[in-house]
Amino acid sequence: MAGSLPHHSLRELARRHGPIMRLQLGEILTIVISSADMVKEILGKNELAFAQRPEIAAVEVMSYENSSFVYSPYGEYWKEMRKICMLELLSMKRVLSFRSIREEECWNMIKTIQSSQGKPANLSKIVLNLINDVTSRAAFGEKCKYRDEFLSFLEEVTLLAGGFELPDLFPSIWFLRYLSRMKPALERLHKKIDVILDHIVAEHEEKLKGNRGNNEEKNAREDLVDVLLNLQKSSETNYFIKPHVIKNIVMELFCAGSDTSSTTTVWAFSEMVRNPRVMEKAQAEVRAVLKGKTQVREQDIQGLEYLKLVVKETLRMHSPGPLMARESREACTINGYEIPKKTKIVINTYAVGRDPEFWSDPESFVPERFLNSSVDFRGSSFEYIPFGGGRRICPGINFGIANIELPLAQLLYHFDWSLADGVKAQDLDMSETFGITSRRKTPLIMVAEPCVPFSYDGDHDK
C-alpha cells in the first residue's frame, strides 16, 4: 500500500473482510478498524489501553530528542504537554485573542484575489499562504520571514509521516531509512528549520527582556513563543519546558495548524463548487446575514448556521487525518479478539465517515444531514471522529475551526466563483493524495468575480 491511497485500499478490504482486520504489514502486526462500533471499543471502552501512538520514522528524525508532543508515549511528559496546550496555548481564550490576526489576514487574502482581476487563481496556494500567515503570527507574533522553508518542511513531513513508508513497515532494517532517502532528506531540512527556530526564540527572549515590568504591553502582544518562554521560567513547568521542547512544540503547532486547516478549507470549497446547490445556499445565507456589510467579522460567523453544516460535512467526507494510529499499551480484548501488547491499531476515519450503516447516501455531500443532529466532532460521536477521540483528541480544534470558517465566509461573501477554462462543476477533479493529511491531488484553480463591495476600516492593531 505504500505510495498509493492506503485509506481507500483498507476500506475496500474491510468491505470484504469486516470492520476489524488483522494485517501483517511488513514486520508490524496491525489491526485495522473501519466502523463506529469498533471505534467505540478502541476510543471508548478501552481508551486508556490505546492512549499510545506508534513510533514513526519521520517523526524520530524531525523531533528534538524525542520530545514530540503529538507522538510522545503516554506518560507524565505527555500529560504535562497536553495540559500546557489545553490551558495555555490553545484555550478558547487564547484562540479568541488571535481574532484580529485572522481578520487582517483574511482581508489580505481578499485583496490578493481581487488583484487577479478575473484571471484564474490558485485557491489552494492562496488558502495555504493565508493559514500559514495566521499561524505564524499567532506563534511568532509576525509573519514568518521563512515561509518558503517552513512550507517545504511541511510538504515533506506531510508526505513521509503517514506511517506507511518502508522504514515504518520494516523498522529493524535500519538502512532502509537511507535507501529510501527519507532520513537524509529530512535531516537536511530539519537543520535549516532548526537554525530558523533558534533565531525566532532568541528574538523573543530579547523582546521579553525589554518588556519586563510592562504587563499591559506584554499581555496585549503575547504570542505562543512568549507563552512558552514565560512557562519555562515557572517553577511548576520548567522541568518539562526545555529549550528544545519549545522548538518542538512550535514546530508541531505550526505544521498541524497550517496543514489541517488549509486542507479542510480547500476541500470545503471544492465540494461547494462540485455541488452548486450547496454553494448557492451557503452564499445566500452569508449575504443575507451580513446584509450589505463591507467586511466579514468573526462575530458574524455565529449566525451562519448553514456554513457550519458545510464544514461539518466536509470533515465527514475529508477527515484531516484519513488514518489514525494508536498502539496497545497492554494486552486486551476487542470484540472477542485478543490484542497483544504493542500492537499497532489503525482507525480508518475515511471509512468510518462513509459507513452506510451510520450515514445515509454517504458518498454525497449533503450538509443538511447535520440539521437537528447531536453528532459532534469533539470525540463523543464514534461515527464521526475527524479530530480523533479520547485522551489523544486534537487539542487544536477551536484554533482549527476558527481558521476554516472565517476564510470560507469571506470567499463566499465577496466573490462569485467559476472554474477556470470552462470546466463544468461535475467534471472537477476530486482526486487526493495521502500523508498525515489527505490533500487535493491537483490545485483548485478558480476565477473570482467581485460581487459585494468591500473596504477595511483598519481598526485592529497590526
Whereabouts are the PLM-identified features?
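Cytochrome P450 heme-thiolate monooxygenase catalytic core
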Residues: 54-62, 96-265, 281, 298-299
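Cytochrome P450 heme-binding "Cys pocket" and the immediately downstream C-terminal segment
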Residues: 145, 276-278, 397-437
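Cytochrome P450 heme-thiolate "Cys pocket" and heme-binding signature region
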Residues: 251, 373-404, 429-433
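Classical protein tyrosine phosphatase
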Residues: 32-42, 48-51, 138-150, 258-284, ...
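Cytochrome P450 substrate-recognition site 1
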Residues: 1-97, 101, 122, 127-134, ...
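Conserved cytochrome P450 K-helix/beta-meander segment immediately N-terminal to the heme-binding cysteine loop
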Residues: 301, 325, 347-375
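C-terminal helix/juxtamembrane-tail motif
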Residues: 436-462
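Conserved cytochrome P450 K-helix E-x-x-R motif and the immediately C-terminal K′/meander segment
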Residues: 1-18, 195, 276, 297-337, ...
